C-alpha cells in the first residue's frame, strides 16, 4: 500500500541523502 511505499522511500532517502530528494522534487515539478 501507500504507507508501505512511504516507509520504503523514507528509508531510502535517509540512506541516499538529501541530494536524491532535491533531484526527485525537481523532476516532480517539471
Swiss-Prot record:
<dbReference type="GO" id="GO:0031640">
    <property type="term" value="P:killing of cells of another organism"/>
</dbReference>
<keyword id="KW-0929">Antimicrobial</keyword>
<keyword id="KW-0044">Antibiotic</keyword>
<protein>
    <recommendedName>
        <fullName>U1-poneritoxin-Ng3e</fullName>
    </recommendedName>
</protein>
<dbReference type="GO" id="GO:0050832">
    <property type="term" value="P:defense response to fungus"/>
</dbReference>
<dbReference type="Pfam" id="PF07442">
    <property type="entry name" value="Ponericin"/>
</dbReference>
<dbReference type="GO" id="GO:0005576">
    <property type="term" value="C:extracellular region"/>
</dbReference>
<keyword id="KW-0964">Secreted</keyword>
<comment type="similarity">
    <text>Belongs to the ponericin-G family.</text>
</comment>
<comment type="function">
    <text>Has activity against some Gram-positive bacteria and S.cerevisiae. Has a non-hemolytic activity.</text>
</comment>
<keyword id="KW-0295">Fungicide</keyword>
<dbReference type="GO" id="GO:0042742">
    <property type="term" value="P:defense response to bacterium"/>
</dbReference>
<dbReference type="InterPro" id="IPR010002">
    <property type="entry name" value="Poneritoxin"/>
</dbReference>
Amino acid at each position: 500500500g501507500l504507507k508501505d511505499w512511504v516507509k520504503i522511500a523514507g528509508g531510502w532517502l535517509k540512506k541516499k541523502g538529501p541530494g536524491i530528494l532535491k533531484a526527485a522534487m525537481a523532476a516532480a515539478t517539471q
